[in-house]
Amino acid sequence: MLWAIQTFLPLSGKTNPTGRSSHFRKRCRHLSGILVGLLIFNGCAAVSIKNWQQHAAQLPAQFELHTVPFYPQEKYQCGPASLAMALGWSGLQIAPDDLTPQVFTPALKGSLQPAMVAAARRHGRVAYEIAGANALLKEIAAGHPVIVLQNLGLSWIPLWHYAVVIGYDLGAEVVILHSGVTNQKITALRTFDNTWARGKYWGLVVLPPDRLPATAEENSYLKAVVGLENARQWTAAIAAYKAALSRWQQSFSAHIGLGNSYYALGNLKSAEEVLLMTTRRFPEQGVAFNNLAQVLWEQGKKQEALKAARHAVMLGGPLVDEFQKTLEQIQADTP
């Protein structure tokens, strides 16, 4: 049996910005005149524009993406519309209506963040969560649109809304959004910061699997790639693990993930090559030898498989009982 190293967990979702169940009632409504007035008043609260400018010290002062398609949302459909825009930019042309069954919860009249993430992964895309101005600006400057969750209402009257950030101009103190029914919506940075803050600065980058996020961190990125495995998107997972290894050459988890993804795809030869290389680079890791033994055995290379399985048991560790099962399975099949 093949084993993966779960030094990171599949995304369960830091998805509750308010800490209350009302967070999940994401709405995409037009504000009434009264609420607009309240929002404008609240938008005048002090926010440090300098913080945004400091985050962009090494970035262009302004940047706009012109390759993100725009889909005007229908009522309550900001989730499907935003995801369709991000997927379209990544090279997958999918209409919002086709995404609605995957992300929209009719009883809530909205889309949950985990559903947005899961849908992106089912379509073979790396869904990478970010948070805060620094990450947002870096991703935009790298040419990556970012889905954001805003509360266009107030903390006690939430109006949840997904939009796609496609640009910024820090000199003019604005961000540029595909939002609602408005293409390239110019929004005051002060107002955007307030509405985004109420969503705990949650953002989502949706990328082709061979492309790393500008703000990628090893464990967070590999957790996102595990999501592709969970979605059985093996070809995409292979591309994403290769991208990870181009950045983190000594990542044991990326090596194991790549080998396991080849195995799941039925490409035993490539799985063997990757796992053999992994045992040489990480000779103290029993999982690598155990998985190599399984792949060798399934190719009929029983003596080599026995050697690898015995070595895994010799190395021991918390999974030694599983390694022993692999060894016994191979021994039972070996004359």
Where are these regions (language model features)?
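Conserved active-site-adjacent core of cysteine acyl-enzyme catalytic domains
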Residues: 45-69, 89, 94, 98-208, ...
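Active-site-adjacent structural segments surrounding the nucleophilic cysteine of cysteine proteases
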Residues: 43-109, 152, 171, 218-221, ...
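N-terminal compositionally biased, intrinsically disordered segments and leader/signal-like regions
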Residues: 8, 16-19, 279, 335
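Bacterial N-terminal signal peptides that target proteins for export
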Residues: 5, 14-34
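Bacterial N-terminal signal peptides
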Residues: 32-42
